[in-house]
Amino acid sequence: MALALCCMSHSPLLNLPGPSRDLLDDIDAAIARARGFVEDYDPQLVVIFSPDHYNGFFYKVMPPFCIGSSASGVGDYGTHAGPLDVPEKLAVDCAQAVLDAGVDIAVSASMDVDHGTVQPLEKLFGTAISRPVIPVFVNAIGVPLGPMHRCRALGAAVGTYLATLDKRVLVMGSGGLSHSPPVPTLATAPEPVLQRIVHGAPMTAEQRQARQAAVIDAARSFAAGDSALQPLNPTWDHRFLEIIDRGSLSELDRWSNSFVTHEGGGSAHEIRTWVAAFAALQAAGPYETTMRYYTPAPELIAGFAIRTARPK
């Protein structure tokens, strides 16, 4: 058994017009460093904790956590469309181990995943299907949300199971850090949008194009300082990164959902995927972060971070 970790932010704007060449070059250079770490490790299995943006999970049934025993990319924002290489038996065994550890988790035999899962895989491996992958959905936008300590418990249970495998496993977390992009909510969404976020009504090509244009416009306004969206919070981002860098994950148990929203924004709850991933790594013992990157990126409407880590 061996474990290693790579966590990174994601953004649809990495695949869209708008961000400056300097910013993209800086992020690409950081991703290349992370890619080198992963290539040297050469994982035989990837387990990725990731959120969803109303592409695979909807309010009709919104589990806090779900493991996919089969999964397909929906192809949003130019990412991979089609099946992922999910080892079904390992995924089901992992789900059983998590349940046995006292963490209630759903299982999907047909999980749809979006750019939150696929983009980091493509950035690290070139394609989303180059390695066997077990996707673990972590709800980060569909309120009510559970407490942070349950995300840590989820990760610890997954990591304990992975420690029983005779494989090199890369654990990933996708999302964050501080950001509050325009995301529909039950309280504010108009009826057509409610049909989508509650019942999963499919989007037409025209609707997807309109959403993409809206994201580009929102980022342009945000970067220009002409936006009502909640500002990024680099101070809070660095506080979070410092906690995970020193392995003090239990400190995050005290971070209430209202605190995360107030400090980091409505979508900052994606840090839950990082908490789960680092808890999975920590289940194998103390760890050290080996590559650290952070930049506040208004052009992406996100505090963009990358970490790699391995056991000490």
Swiss-Prot record:
Active site as annotated: H115, H179
A GO BP entry: 3-phenylpropionate catabolic process
**Is ATP-binding given among the entry's keywords?**
no
Copy the pathway line from the protein's UniProt record.
Aromatic compound metabolism; 3-phenylpropanoate degradation
Could you list this entry's UniProt keywords, alphabetically sorted: Aromatic hydrocarbons catabolism, Dioxygenase, Iron, Oxidoreductase
Which reactions is this enzyme annotated as catalysing? Answer: 3-(2,3-dihydroxyphenyl)propanoate + O2 = (2Z,4E)-2-hydroxy-6-oxonona-2,4-dienedioate + H(+); (2E)-3-(2,3-dihydroxyphenyl)prop-2-enoate + O2 = (2Z,4E,7E)-2-hydroxy-6-oxonona-2,4,7-trienedioate + H(+)
Which InterPro entries does the protein's record reference?
Answer: DHPP/DHXA_dioxygenase (IPR023789), Xdiol_dOase_suB (IPR004183)
The record's listing under Pfam families reads:
LigB
Cofactor(s) recorded in Swiss-Prot or TrEMBL: Fe(2+)
Q: Enumerate the GO terms in the molecular function aspect.
A: 3-carboxyethylcatechol 2,3-dioxygenase activity; ferrous iron binding
Respond yes or no to whether keyword ATP-binding is given for this record. no
User: Which EC number(s) does the record attach to this protein?
Assistant: 1.13.11.16
The UniProt family comment states: Belongs to the LigB/MhpB extradiol dioxygenase family.
Function, in words: Catalyzes the non-heme iron(II)-dependent oxidative cleavage of 2,3-dihydroxyphenylpropionic acid and 2,3-dihydroxicinnamic acid into 2-hydroxy-6-ketononadienedioate and 2-hydroxy-6-ketononatrienedioate, respectively.
- Quaternary structure, from the entry: Homotetramer.
Q: From the Swiss-Prot or TrEMBL record, give the protein name.
A: 2,3-dihydroxyphenylpropionate/2,3-dihydroxicinnamic acid 1,2-dioxygenase
Q: Which organism is it from?
A: Mycolicibacterium paratuberculosis (strain ATCC BAA-968 / K-10) (Mycobacterium paratuberculosis)
Query: What is the primary gene name for this protein?
Result: mhpB
